[in-house]
Amino acid sequence: MNLMDGLTFEQQASRNFLLQRCTFQRHPIQEERKKERILYVSLLNRLVRSQLDPDPELTACLQRLLQVLDVSAEEMKAEETAIPKGLKKLASVFWHGGFSFGLKNYQALCLVESVCLVGLAAHDSKEKMQAVLADFCKTGKIAETLQQSLTDYFNHLFTVTVMTPGKELAASASYLDFMYGRLFRYRELPRYHVAICATMSAGKSTFINSLLGSDYIPSGNEACTAKITSIADNDIFPELLGCCREKEVLHPPVTPVTNEVLQTWNMNEDIAHVFLEGDLQGVGSEQTVLVVHDTPGTNSSENPLHHQRTMDFLKHHPLQTIIYLLNAEHISTSDNKTLLLEIKHNVLDVVPQTHIVFLVNKVDSFDLESGDDLTQTLDDACQDLEKLGFKEPQVIPVMAYAARLFKMALMGQENRFTRKEKLEFADFFERCLEENLDLTKYQCHIDLPGQAPTASGSVIIGKHTYDKGKIAEALRCTGICSVADLLDEAVHHYQPEDKPLSPAEVLQQQKDGALSEEEKELLADLDQWEQENVDEPLSEEQEMADLLADLDQWEENNS
């Protein structure tokens, strides 16, 4: 599938996910006679197709509706009732059940559902959809009073409002709200973008999986692939969907996205970007969509492509926060210095409102009993960052691997533990609770003790029984809850701009502004000459010609 005009690949993926989530379950006309079902889907198909070019995702979406209504493609195509006449028939569908009988109105439902599908497939705004509705009403010769009622109903689909639908939609309103209202409200939510950056072997994949509560990033991802993985939170539709971009082609959505699918995408070097959408555990907001972007782990000496892909993404994608992971075992490296300086120069200095927070991972490698000084190590890290130009850097130490094991136990996934992981779980649990290793006490320029998740009950791991409440407290001690709280607070207080800009867009705006000022100066000189020489002899026209030539040359050089 090629990129739609005006949409980024990320927007196109989100649009495809919305169409994929159109399951048409609980459709009101599903219980009617087959001839009414055929008429309904035929009219809907013709209305939708009248507005859109052929699209494989839309075709797949309409195919699901045929399956739900138990109508074949041949039966749909054979229905040739004219649209005005067909809509009139749908306004008075006879039904009977037992000793009851009467008429049902599906005319309004067909019109609204057609416009909703067009709006999702074309990524239309509410205003554009209302214009499409007006066009459909004109085609179907619908009365103006009904058209106004349907237009008013669209406001309800986009915003959470209390309203009483007109009698034409009374029986269908709950389906429309369940099917489309949730989709459009999710689509309209602002997005808070977080990029995760690190050099090789910082434990970035483990950190992302422990933060989000599932194995979204295959183990060893940073060492073998130069791709971006973007994961969007969707609390309304928790089922995980995914698709990938191979070169300049966006592939259709896949569901369910299994670990095997992720591994296949990860090992394919032609895939440049993976898009995922599902319910992220422990982070997020109902008012804003959190999107986490995993960038390739960089190592400029081994694979410069990883570094290039990371910087290209950071420069050309609007970001609200960057989380930078440092390996506690190797904090001061040339690769770290190179990447951090580029991030500062190309992102933070260009878009100062972008927030950056530093995590020192793999702190569990420290042997405090043998004299390893965690406090001094973190102080040194802060000083090194300040020398690179990061004023009062916020530094949070974390044990991402321990956090991943604790989260798995809390989520009932302890049966997936290997023998080695069971032993490591016991060791981490002992260090956090019995030896009082609380990493939240070692934070620099930030104070986030972290909120332990609520948990009850117990779990058996190996030969030991663990209280889940204590596991939750051990999870808090790893520092991962502090990171989650940091993101939650940022997301909840996020006030989006009209259109957040990437560093590249900001630079282009600055360049355009500078050029326009220079052009204004040239035009001002020209205006002044005209005022001073309006009554001068014709010989002065040569100076005028020279000024015009200068202006033409400038426009040619800067076009």
Give names to the regions the model predicted.
Residues 2-201, 214-281, 346, 371, ...:
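N-terminal low-complexity/disordered regulatory or targeting extensions
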Residues 7-15, 177-437, 457, 468, ...:
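Globular "head" domains of long coiled-coil molecular machines
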Residues 410-559:
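P-loop NTP-binding site
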